A protein has these predicted regions:
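Secretory targeting and sorting signals
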Residues: 1-29
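Post-signal peptide N-terminal regions of Sec-secreted extracellular proteins
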Residues: 29-151
Length: 151
């Protein structure tokens, strides 16, 4: 290799190194994956009921939960909603699902989403994720996809 080519390669390497030395990784200003995934929402709608849950995971054991449901069919079957918490039992090493209490909207089809339910869930076992279940007074029920706990 002649002297000019060596000098050109050396100069390019120094310039590239100097340019990279002053840069910051692209992820430095972006929120962490946990922060991005901490708040999740699922909607479940079918003929008879429509509802949603928004979950903000706070730790490996807790989450803020906000749910609401509406009767969208006017068929005298009240719409109801509950949260399902997927947990890991530490002493047995097995997964289980805690079924929250039903929240019923008795306002009928013209009463909107009814009273919203806003509570903090705190489990004694690690919280793996949550789902929302919507029912039209037991006539038909549907469950959302999982909202995974990023912690």
């Amino acid at each position: 290799m002649n002297v000019h080519k060596r000098l050109a390669l050396a100069t390019a390497a120094v310039a590239l190194g100097a340019g990279l030395a002053g840069t910051v990784p692209a992820q430095a200003d972006q929120p962490s994956v946990s922060a991005q995934a901490a708040t999740q929402r699922r909607d479940v709608c079918f003929s008879g009921a429509c509802g949603s849950a928004t979950v903000t995971f706070q730790s490996h054991y807790s989450a803020k939960v906000s749910m609401s449901v509406a009767d969208n069919r006017c068929d005298a079957h009240p719409a109801k909603v509950r949260i399902l918490a997927d947990q890991y039992h530490l002493s047995t090493g097995s997964r289980y699902t805690w079924h929250g209490p039903w929240r019923v909207n008795h306002r009928g089809c013209h009463g909107g989403t009814g009273p919203a339910w806003n509570k903090t869930f705190v489990g004694g076992d690690p919280l793996l994720g949550m789902k929302v279940e919507i029912c039209n007074d037991g006539v038909k029920c549907q469950t959302s996809s999982e909202m995974y706990n990023p912690y």
